[in-house]
Regions:
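C-terminal regulatory/oligomerization modules of transcriptional regulators
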Residues: 1, 123-141
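N-terminal leader segment of winged-helix/HTH proteins
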Residues: 1-29
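N-terminal positioning helix adjacent to the helix-turn-helix/winged-helix DNA-binding module
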Residues: 4, 34-35, 98, 125
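Alpha-helical linker/hinge and terminal dimerization helices associated
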Residues: 12-15, 19, 23, 59, ...
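N-terminal helix-turn-helix DNA-binding core of bacterial DNA-binding proteins
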Residues: 21-62
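Short, hydrophobic-biased segments on the C-terminal half of alpha helices
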Residues: 52, 70-71
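Charged, amphipathic alpha-helical coiled-coil/dimerization segments
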Residues: 71-128
Length: 141
């Protein structure tokens, strides 16, 4: 038998897989779930840009993991790199105008997927789970 806490983490991991598969199978506007999350964080940030390391920390990945995800987004023009005028060692990831447009369109599809996954759940339960996840891992906003 395993602890309730360990079972919770296993179920969170399974849920993440279910969510990613659902998003990826629908290929929401050509974006996978991780792509969508990156665009969301950039879209929501001040000036629609972030340092790569800050973006990685915000979404819980390594800097190299974020770089692997950003390269295809950069190739298709959804994000770009911007250097810091004061410090050449610092660069920013910026969501492009086209990236903003695609994100806004994909957000509608993402909301529909979310409703499909969570439609039978009560708002109070969702708030409680959201609070627990925030306590465990922080808020992406």
């Amino acid at each position: 038998m395993i602890s309730t806490e360990l079972l919770l983490l296993i179920n969170i991991n399974k849920l993440q897989s279910v969510i990613a598969r659902k998003f990826d199978s629908l290929s929401v506007h050509g974006l996978g779930f991780n792509d969508f999350v990156i665009l969301y964080v950039l879209y929501s940030s001040s000036e629609s840009r972030m340092r790569r390391i800050d973006l990685a920390e915000k979404i819980g990945l390594t800097a190299s993991g974020v770089t692997r995800l950003l390269n295809p987004l950069e190739k298709i023009g959804l994000v770009s790199r911007e250097s810091n005028e004061r410090d050449a060692r610092v660069s920013y990831v910026v969501i492009t105008p086209n990236g903003k447009k695609i994100f806004e369109e994909a957000k509608l599809s993402a909301e529909n997927i979310t409703k499909e996954i969570l439609s039978s759940k009560k708002n109070k339960s969702l708030r409680m789970v959201n609070e627990l996840l925030f306590d465990l891992g922080g808020n992406i906003q």
